[in-house]
Curated annotation (Swiss-Prot):
The gene is rpoZ. It comes from Marinomonas sp. (strain MWYL1). PANTHER family: DNA-DIRECTED RNA POLYMERASE SUBUNIT OMEGA. The keyword Transcription applies. This is DNA-directed RNA polymerase subunit omega. Coiled coil: none annotated. The RNAP catalytic core consists of 2 alpha, 1 beta, 1 beta' and 1 omega subunit. When a sigma factor is associated with the core the holoenzyme is formed, which can initiate transcription. GO terms for cellular component: DNA-directed RNA polymerase complex.
Amino acid sequence: MARVTVEDCLENVDNRFELVMVASKRARQLATGGEDAKVPLEGDKVTVVALREIAENLINAKNVDQQKRPLHEF
């Protein structure tokens, strides 16, 4: 379980506000089953997984809204 820092994530998003918005949207997608994680879960909570995805530049502000949503959100 690698530690994720805000600085790691800020290399891939514009500012802290955007980081919070992207991470919260992605964590909700993961928690509700809308999309599979793009990194190994390793027993981490969905918020940590979301931050790891952002730090590895797998999720960003442009593509977080393009991820699949569960049917109950329509």
